């Protein structure tokens, strides 16, 4: 380039900048720059007269630390100068004669010289093929540069260590694992063991902290010598002796500590770490533990959009719901119940009847036929029914009908929020969905239903419910918070509902918080309130725990076999190892794996697909891969802000992003119109979560498809065989063999025992 930083002609004309007046390489007349002025200029640490700067002046200059005249220092002057790069006669400790650091002539130096060398030449800061701290010819570029501890600055390379692509870590890399060189001990440099296992005497570590230039110094060649070496510009200290993390003593690591181990950070007890602690997580002290405050204020959809958004027409397989066996059990010998075959028999108000019809409901499903009259008669209920069978309406409609009939509503005259019904959900998205479902049924009535969940701006959320809310639906943490501060008053609560109850009771933390809520002094005891629990899965252990919240004469409603999969969903399985998953996914979506292109007529553009993964980073990685293949994809997971999560669901619902890549936050309860295909890129940890995931398709009798990637170490194979059999679907031969305990000839080529792999919502 003709106007490089070190070009002598440009440097003479410029007023500021690297190598110009007032700039990083010195000025022309009296300029104060990083390299001193031409006459009388002061630079980085310069003096008063004769200009002593970081690059020295032209006359009588002295460098970094030099004297007033003729001194020697960092980039000495024209005469008798010496220092960092030396002057014309003063030797060449760094960079050779006549090439001082900001040197004496236009030949070369800090801010001058030829294009091919010098500060800012074609090769970068310092000339040659590489520049100042450059990883590949740029100022601070690549993995090292100007200012980074250890390398001299620049941005750190965060690409995958395995494939060198951005957006994920090597542990999440979908590419085949590359061979690595054998690792050696950090202490003795011998292979076969790590430094903590090393039997050699521990070697002291070299200093690594400091400032400008980092541990590898400005201009050094790998050691700790050089400009800014051993701590950088301004120096640093050598690292002190290693201390044990457990006892803070010197001379050993925590793994070798003779003192008793420190207790769990959460509860203080020994024997486990905080991430394994069975006790509820304690709030962290200080600003750092509080996290950023939520600022999201949602824009509510108008009612016509709400009615249309979640209106799913009955599919051709709708009658399959009515083939299921219905089983009622109770401590009472007989339960006097007449199923309501139509909504006209459900004792709904005239306005609610119209709203139900407007919402697209025409015929009651089995869970609705039995739950509607049982709730109306005042029974506590534990209900289990297939995904997509209308459980939300089964508890909302009778609750709202009874409250309206009794004129038992939270009004402004009560002076605060006295809800008659509390509905708890495991995720924010499900809470928002139930809220909108309730808005439909309560349309043009006097009933107010409000959402309360994390991610919403606290002030906004509080202001909404202080106006009064007969029904509150939300997540446990935020509701508990408002109860504790007195915003939500539970004195008049008549109904307590747990949706996805098995997850609410079984998940660590949820159960304890639920107990806290029901045990508040203001909360009516279970004998004086009605408790309802609904889910598509209800393991025996959870049923046992759930009984503590229910009255003795509660009714258990089981539609078909407890925990059975939706029969409207065709379940398929792809045998593949981890390294093969990415290509399998691309093939399923109609993407050419060689060219990363997609035909415009591909179904992926017209049908909605949900892809479930276990890790947030993998969700973002796959979305990036699909987007590069011109497939509109978006993610939803716990690390995204609520504004982003809500927008992701909105775009998926309206079809502008036909592929949604999700973690566990989207596996339960979400009722999204037009989801044709669910792909389990990563299998869940348990069979119940599998049932819920595939239940995002096949809603209200519409046919759906679920494809799961099964690897050799999947622990769910035997349970999957049972799920397929219960759903009256064909079990592949290789899965039958695997369910017996060995994969055999029909499995993965050898007899390998099934291995259980080792092991997401705040408010």
Swiss-Prot record:
Gene that produces this protein: glh-1
UniProt protein name: ATP-dependent RNA helicase glh-1
Region of interest: Disordered: 1-30, 193-230
Domain Helicase C-terminal: 592-739
Annotated Gly residues bias: 18-30, 209-230
Coiled-coil residue windows: none
Sequence repeats: 24-33, 34-43, 44-53, 54-63, 64-73, 74-83, 84-93
Family, per entry: Belongs to the DEAD box helicase family. DDX4/VASA subfamily.
CDD domains in the record: SF2_C_DEAD
Keyword hit for Repeat: yes
Effect of residue 589 to W: No effect on the interaction with kgb-1
UniProt motif DEAD box: location: 499-502
PROSITE patterns in alphabetical order: DEAD_ATP_HELICASE, HELICASE_ATP_BIND_1, HELICASE_CTER, Q_MOTIF, ZF_CCHC
Zinc finger (CCHC-type): 158-175, 183-200, 242-259, 262-279
